[in-house]
A protein has these predicted regions:
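C-terminal outer-membrane/trafficking sorting elements
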Residues: 31, 391, 397, 426-513
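Propeptide-to-catalytic entry region of secreted or membrane-anchored zinc metalloproteases
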Residues: 36-148, 152-157, 323
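Active-site-proximal segment of zinc-dependent metalloprotease catalytic domains
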Residues: 137-214
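The catalytic-center signature of Zn2+-dependent metalloproteases
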Residues: 186-290
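Residue-level detector of functionally pivotal "anchor" positions at catalytic/ligand-binding pockets or at interdomain
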Residues: 317-335, 415-436
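Conserved aromatic anchor
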Residues: 345-353
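Beta-strand-rich modules
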Residues: 386-402
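Extracellular fibronectin type III
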Residues: 401-419
Length: 513
């Protein structure tokens, strides 16, 4: 692993004064890209308010772990880009991180749903921040109240993997405090950083809190879980020291470690520390982590499960009712034997029950070359997104804010022809005629404007492969006319050519379902 940045206690004291209870979370090594596996977390010790709250929960854990009601928490996701719109990550990549987050929180019976589509913020001072102040401003200006605000941005200028705020410690104000900020390089779909940061956001300290600086200190968490040790041995203090959880073994390792660990450390009783690498709130490598403890899960639930809880405002607004996604979308076009024009390709599918958004992926040689989200049941690929005379395949799936883990349809192959034409219009330079709408449904007439009255106008409609569909002529009486196309036109893309008095115009049309 590349060199790490080590934060001293004095550093955290300075940061506390500067940031007002901001606890940084996940400092990267010099090689970005793999969530926590290549970077240390820099979150400081949990604030006193968090520790007091966790201590108050100790007697309630048995009842909490028997609570089987699911808690649904609202999320607002933000993608930060430069002021020119450069950089960032895709909306579908954010969906993948939320899907992964939900899978990791299943044992806690907590799920996260998106309240709306991902928000894009184009601001270079937030995108390439080299200090915390712009990010504090970002949160103050953009947080959506009563939701968990997650920001995805470029933190490489600060060598950070991400950071989060404990309850009641961050910017944003009443029922709006704090956020989770993730770097792009740490937002891998299978990474554990986001689960780790949500743990902090929901009141979980690191497993080594208050122990790593001096494992033999009397206030450090001891290994024993016996509350009635015989002197001179000291009894267990796991509910009032360390991370305040007695079902997470005492931990002393405050740097990234591979599992199993070969480090040897004794506590004040002379007992050997045996930290558990499987906990998300430890510093073990990503491939070691897989769970929260029952008491950790109970504490996170308690943090949101009543109006008076530290983040109880997250459950004040009833969650929306999302439809259940049934099956996968049935594809209409292209099918296995179909050929499409690469610069004018229309992809169509039937609506899927419960979906209000669709994700379309196109592959070449099993490589995903195109990935987009559309709110309708078709996508019109224009320009050079596809290459001519090639073999491709495609899949589509339905999504909604409550289910970002749905299955894709089976993959079907298709071919592309050569490019048929380019550009939206091909007009005679002096002819200013207009055709609208260019997106139409059955029965919609097309309006022709700025044509010459009294001069015959000839029109021809061809399909996406250049085949003639129908022709006709008009005798306009003034500078405008209505053109009624056949009502039985299949859904798809077309080319309308107009000719009048040595002038010519070509317009792309799209017949909608």
């Amino acid at each position: 692993m590349t060199s790490m940045l080590t934060l001293s206690l004095s550093f955290f004291n300075r940061m506390h004064r500067v940031l007002g209870m901001l606890w940084i979370a996940c400092i990267l090594g010099l090689t970005p890209g793999f969530a926590q596996s290549n970077g240390e977390c820099g979150t400081g010790p949990a604030p006193a308010s968090t520790l007091r709250y966790l201590e108050s929960l100790a007697s309630t854990y048995d009842a909490q772990t028997e609570d089987t009601v699911w808690i649904r928490l609202p999320v607002t996701a933000h993608i930060i880009r430069s002021s020119s719109g450069f950089g960032g990550m895709s909306e579908s990549a954010v969906f993948a991180t939320i899907c992964n987050l939900n899978e990791r929180f299943v044992p806690a019976r907590i799920s996260f749903y998106l309240t709306e589509r991902v928000k894009f913020i184009d601001n270079t001072s937030f995108y390439g921040a080299t200090s915390y102040q712009p990010l504090m401003t970002m949160i103050d200006q953009n947080n959506v109240p009563r939701t968990i605000n997650i920001y995805y941005t470029d933190l490489s200028g600060m060598s950070l993997c991400g950071f989060a705020f404990y309850p009641l410690t961050g910017p944003g104000g009443f029922q709006n405090d704090g956020a989770v900020v993730m770097s792009f390089g740490c937002s891998q779909p299978q990474g554990t950083t986001l689960a780790h940061e949500l743990g902090h956001y929901l009141n979980l300290p690191h497993t080594f809190d208050e122990t790593s600086s001096n494992p033999v200190d009397p206030i450090a968490e001891r290994v024993t879980r016996n509350f009635n040790e015989v002197a001179p041995r000291l009894s267990a203090n796991c509910f009032t020291a360390g991370d305040r959880f007695c079902d997470t073994p005492s931990d002393f390792i405050a740097s990234r470690w591979a599992c199993p660990s070969s480090r040897v450390q004794l506590d004040l009783n002379g007992d050997l520390f045996r930290p558990d690498s499987s906990y998300y709130m430890s510093y073990s490598n990503d491939n070691c982590m897989s769970r929260f403890s029952p008491q950790q899960m109970a504490a996170m639930r308690a943090t949101v499960n009543s109006p008076s809880a530290p983040r109880g405002y997250l459950t004040l607004t009833p969650p929306p009712v999302f439809g259940t996604l049934v099956g996968t979308p049935t594809k209409i076009f292209p099918q296995i034997t179909d050929t499409v024009v690469p610069n004018n390709a229309l992809f169509r599918w039937h609506p899927q029950q419960g979906a209000n958004l669709y994700q379309l992926r196109i592959f070449q040689f099993n490589v995903n070359v195109f990935d987009t989200l559309v709110p309708d049941t078709f996508y019109h690929a224009l320009g050079n997104r596809l290459r001519g005379v090639r073999q491709y395949s495609w899949v589509v799936r339905g999504l909604n804010g409550g289910d970002l883990c749905s299955a894709f349809s089976p993959r079907d192959s298709f071919s592309t022809s050569t490019y048929v034409f380019a550009g939206i219009n091909e007009n005679t330079a002096s002819w200013q005629a207009k055709v609208y709408p260019t997106l139409f449904r059955e029965g919609d007439p097309l309006t022709l404007a700025h044509i010459q009255p009294g001069i015959p106008l000839v029109w021809k409609l061809t399909d996406h492969l250049g085949r003639q569909v129908c022709v006709g002529n008009l005798q306009p009486e003034d500078s405008g006319a209505l053109l009624h196309l056949p009502g039985d036109l299949p859904t798809g893309s077309y080319r309308l050519e107009l000719r009048q008095n040595q002038q010519r115009m070509t317009v792309k049309l799209l017949r909608l379902p």
